[in-house]
Amino acid sequence: MKKRNITEFQVLSEIIRKQPHIKQKEIAENLGITVQAVSEHIRNLVKEGYVKSRGRGEYVVTEKGLRKLKNWISEFKDYLDEINTAVYRYKDIWPAIADEDVKDGETVYLFMKNGLLYASKQPKGEAKAKALYGGKKGEDIAICEIKGIIDVPKGKVIVFRIPPEVVGGSRAVDFNLIKENIDNLDDYVIATMGTVAYVVACKLGLKPDIRFAVPEAIVNACNRGCNVIALITGKMAEKVIKKLDNAKISYTVLDATKENK
């Protein structure tokens, strides 16, 4: 319905509620519009034959107007039903990444990987859902009717203490130590804190996933099932470690300073 039609529907509804004695000022106050606007809408309703004027402020809805009002009610109800459906569909639909090709309507099992929700046709745990809209492997799909609990084990953290610039910065880093430990992990998120740590990551060919609000972001990543490689400059590591302790997240701390020979 157009905005003008909605307002005329409201005016017509007010008339049928209070006919034949109509007070335009009262209608204007009820609808939050001006008296002039009410007067204009009434003139249009009379012109269209939906309302009949008896003079002296008396108006009655005609049979034609009654049919039109019923038609508007039906249209408005359909419109509200569409909105209501959209609201609840939005609320009940969740995105997931297809771990394999998934068709509309298929049952899928849900699991977390790299902090993202995946859907597979193979049992991956007790949580399952229905694929409302399927897709190819790696595409986003829409899932609904989620049942069960999605298992999200907490990730672990390896904290590398990176020497600050005053003791050599990246020039004093044992890059082999970092590489060896990274090679032992399959999936991980890279976090850097401090300029030197960022430079070290770049020299290792690593693209940091976390650079801002680092302690909090590391905890959030672990809570979503991600393992984290944290390159932290100097004393900043203490802040990260304290946050991990408070969140009861498992971690290992390694000093990445190169040994002097």
Curated annotation (Swiss-Prot):
This is Uncharacterized protein MJ0558. GO terms for biological process: regulation of DNA-templated transcription. GO terms for molecular function: DNA binding. It holds the Pfam family HTH_24.
